[in-house]
Amino acid sequence: MKGQHFIVTGGTSGLGLSIVRKLLENKVNVTLLVRDVDKAARIFEQESGKTINVIPCDLNDMKSIQALQFEENISFDGFIYSAGLGYFKSISDHNFSEMIETYQLNLISFNVLYTVLRPYLTSNAHIVGISSQAAFSTQANAAHYGASKAGFYALMNALRLESPNLHIMTVNVGPIDTPFHQKADPSMKYAKKMGKIMLDANQLAEDIIYGIKTKQLEINRPKWMHHGLKMYQIAPRFFERCFPKLFKNKA
């Protein structure tokens, strides 16, 4: 990976930040798309001797994405989409802006950004999308989040078929110990419930870097959760009826 150039979203917080730091450790040149340039400057001011470029872009603003411009001779060996959000509340409790924001950031913005970046991607570029185990299950009080991630997962699989020259890797994760939960559930009740099984962002970032190097198609963490959800998909209504608490743990 040394000397390659990756463009990353969501790189100033949580898992995205851990991924960026692992990329820099591997001598990768990084371009960050961020909404808050000052925040990025503060976070990475100590990264002396490492190549990192920051470009302002609001992923909730389609015009901001479409207006992105790069030098003609620039190319990207990898594109990591780590931006995302969710609100852990019932369908009826979501307001219009929360619904639109969820699908826009988790799904639509990736499509628009990929279209903008496509001319700058190398012929065998790595496309890494951070999805969720929520894509594989029905969850009360996380319907829009789960639906957006299910759509994203389907999209990544289709992209793999349509562009076999690209390395498409989807990362499906359970709860991670990151600031994501502060916005998803300000009460932090869900985070406290899941405290013992929270994934470590730094270890997950290590796994993602290894997955890029070895061209894995999927990373599923924690593995036990993914295996359990595979069983759930065989008879989903049966599991929902017999184990209702498992599907209402965000309430």
Predicted regions and their residues:
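Residue(s) in the substrate-gating loop at a strand-loop-helix junction
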Residues: 132
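Rossmann-fold cofactor-recognition segment
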Residues: 47-62
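Conserved NAD(P)H cofactor-binding loop of Rossmann-fold oxidoreductase domains
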Residues: 82-87
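C-terminal helical subdomain
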Residues: 170, 191-227
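Active-site helix of classical SDR
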Residues: 114, 148
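Conserved glycine-rich cofactor-binding loop
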Residues: 12-13
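Substrate-binding pocket helix/loop in short-chain dehydrogenase/reductase
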Residues: 90-91, 95-101
